[in-house]
Regions:
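Flexible, glycine/small-residue-enriched loop-and-beta-strand segment within the central core
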Residues: 34, 38-41, 61-71, 76-144, ...
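A generic "structured core" feature
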Residues: 90, 133, 151-153, 157
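Short helix N-cap motif at coil->helix boundaries in the Bergerat
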Residues: 160, 177
Length: 188
């Protein structure tokens, strides 16, 4: 059976994560926060397809069964983050609070049928390369690849691929500068 297959261990970890661990205090909360972080990591890591070293899964993060979700070393899911469908986070990825990664969509092409009867489209996985920072409340849509070293401004909606080292912002997001470049507007 694969790691993401059904097993007693997975069922128990699922129950512990969604029944207890995801409700524990934010990891930087004085006192119990660091312990809560370790409990969430312990409960969540076996649910993911891959979990690297020192991952962080914050309070309220929702990732379904974890099927198709891979998190690289020193990366994590922020406070109240939502993952719907396959997602790969590289190494050293910071995800701010309330970000959404949505790799699922509904079929809408048949105008003779109500959209509720058209079912789901095939998942289009989201890939986030290494060393990326997502500000708060970013939405990433199906099939997007976010390039190495990028910075995504708070509240941005990512509808297409982001080049390496780009700083993007807006709805839909657009490149406002590249990291390391001088004399260009900064993301605020």
């Amino acid at each position: 059976m694969t790691k993401v297959g059904l097993s007693l261990k997975r069922i128990l970890k699922f129950g512990v994560y969604y029944g207890v661990a995801d409700k524990l205090p934010y990891s930087v909360t004085a006192g119990f926060g660091p312990t809560a972080k370790r409990v969430r990591r312990w409960a969540a890591k076996d649910l993911f397809e891959h979990a690297g070293q020192r991952i962080n899964v914050e309070k309220g993060a929702w990732f379904g069964s974890g099927r198709g979700v891979s998190i690289g070393d020193r990366s994590g899911l922020g406070l109240d983050c939502l993952v719907m469908g396959p997602l790969t986070l590289g190494r050293d990825v910071m995800v701010g609070p309330r970000c959404m990664f949505i790799s699922q969509a509904h079929n809408t092409g048949d105008v003779s049928l109500p959209m509720t009867d058209q079912g789901m489209a095939e998942d289009r996985p989201i890939v986030v390369e290494d060393d990326v920072w997502f500000g708060a409340a970013v939405i990433v849509l199906p099939g997007v690849r976010v390039g190495h070293g990028s910075v995504i401004g708070a509240g941005s909606i990512i509808t297409k691929d982001v080049p390496p080292f780009a700083c993007v912002a807006g709805s839909p997001a657009r490149v406002v500068k590249y990291r390391g470049s001088e004399g260009t507007p900064s993301v605020s």
